[in-house]
UniProtKB/Swiss-Prot annotation:
Residues 237-398 form the Helicase C-terminal domain. It is an enzyme of class 3 (hydrolase). It comes from Eremothecium gossypii (strain ATCC 10895 / CBS 109.51 / FGSC 9923 / NRRL Y-1056). GO terms for biological process: maturation of SSU-rRNA from tricistronic rRNA transcript (SSU-rRNA, 5.8S rRNA, LSU-rRNA); mRNA splicing, via spliceosome. Its EC number is 3.6.4.13. The keyword DNA repair does not apply. PANTHER family: ATP-DEPENDENT RNA HELICASE DBP3. It catalyses: ATP + H2O = ADP + phosphate + H(+). This is ATP-dependent RNA helicase FAL1. A motif (Q motif) lies at residues 23-51. It holds the Pfam family DEAD.
Length: 398
């Protein structure tokens, strides 16, 4: 895994106080086996957010860390967490909560990869699969649990997991976790009441709304804030275009035309509803296009299979709702198509960031009906960007 060092260096980092910056992982005084895992994972030097946040996490400070999608946020809290975990004990010591099952699974894998030489056990505990599977794994010992709030709270209430020794709680994609729409907020409150009062809290997100900052005041003690202001969140590596289609029903033909014209490695197509995802994937398959689809109503085994096939490259076009937009890193994605513009302005960066992970170049194409012109202008204003009309010379995009 790598990121564009020049791109990362352009990010302006704002902190609540003058924090020390660690130019190398060695300067953080990390355990030797953790350094082996970091370099084995492909990191060479810390990113802007890593160079500031990791040492604060290790010191035991509560931390609010905001960085753009693809700058190494997951590795930031994972490295800090692994440094302070006592692997000689079988106790659960760190809890990571995420808004989606896929993200929770990915985080547990990152913990295992970075902690490869440390004998650290990390489990993903999410809904959609038999509880008994998680119980048998937890009983063998678990240092880090990465899960969704509902499943984790259920396991705490059933006394399947013991939280007495949890010293760190991480809220990943906190803006989503703490939003009213997903209904996780009360579950998070309930989980907090089951943790030791001394628990260290780390909040990580690509966007940080005022509501999130207010909610974190309830749970955090004098947190260190490391923030990238919204208008400094870089979309520089991603070419963004729009295609005017006038009517909704014309979007499908436009998409088919793009398939014939664009040479793509892998592509993600976003729709706003599960029904639209099912409809579009069915219609494309009817027209002999090979596509896969994923959304929250699918069985967990089916979702895992879709993600596995897409990661391996055996499927190259994925149609999805916003469930896939946050945090999932598939490095080969070079094109994102917004079949529908996102309902929430904040989700625009999560969606199109799929095509420009870690500073890689990508293309984002937005289908715009007459009714969506106003929404497009709102996105441009929100991110201080200009989304250009699609050029006639499509070959120039690649």
């Amino acid at each position: 895994m790598s990121f564009d060092r020049n791109q990362d260096g352009k990010l302006k980092v704002k902190t609540s106080s003058k924090l020390p910056v660690s130019p190398t992982f060695e300067s953080m005084k990390l355990q030797e086996n953790l350094l082996r895992g970091i370099y084995g994972y492909g990191f060479e030097a810390p990113s802007a957010i890593q160079s500031r946040a990791i040492t604060q996490i290790i010191r035991g400070k509560d931390v609010i860390a905001q960085a753009q999608s693809g700058t190494g946020k997951t590795a930031t809290f994972t490295i800090g967490m692994l440094q302070v975990i006592d692997s000689s004990s079988k106790d659960l010591q760190a809890l990571v909560l995420s808004p989606t099952r896929e993200l929770a699974a990915q985080i547990s894998q990152v913990v295992r990869n970075l902690g490869d030489y440390m004998n650290v056990v990390a489990l993903a505990c999410t809904g959609g699969k038999a509880l008994q599977q998680d119980i048998s794994k937890v009983n063998k010992g678990c240092h880090v649990m990465s899960g969704t709030p509902g499943r984790v709270l259920d396991m705490i209430k059933r006394r399947i997991i013991n939280t007495r020794h949890v010293k760190m709680l991480v809220l990943d994609e906190a803006d989503e976790l703490l939003s009213e729409t997903l209904g996780f907020k009360q579950q998070l409150y309930d989980i907090f009441t089951k943790l030791p009062s001394s628990v260290q809290v780390v909040v990580v997100s690509a966007t940080m709304s005022k509501d999130v900052l207010e909610v974190t005041k309830k749970f955090m003690s004098d947190p260190v804030k490391i923030l990238v202001k919204r208008d400094e969140v870089s979309l520089e590596g991603i070419k963004q275009y729009h295609i005017n289609v006038d009517k909704e029903e014309w979007k499908f033909d436009t998409l088919c035309d793009l398939y014939d014209s664009l040479t793509i490695t892998q592509c993600v197509i976003f729709c706003n509803t599960k029904k639209k995802v099912d409809w579009l994937s069915h219609k494309l398959i009817q027209n002999n296009f090979a596509v896969a689809s994923i959304h929250g109503d699918m069985k967990q085994d089916d979702r895992d299979k879709v993600m596995s096939d897409f990661r391996s490259g055996s499927s190259r076009v994925l149609i999805s709702t916003d469930v896939w937009a946050r945090g999932i890193d598939v490095q080969q994605v070079s094109l994102v198509i917004n079949y529908d513009l996102p309902e929430l302005l904040e989700n625009y960066i999560h969606r199109i960031g799929r095509s420009g992970r870690f500073g890689r170049k990508g293309v984002a194409i937005n289908f715009i009906t007459r009714e969506e012109v106003t929404k497009l202008k709102s996105i441009e204003k929100h991110y201080s960007i200009k989304i250009k009309p699609m050029p006639a010379d499509i070959d120039s995009l690649s």
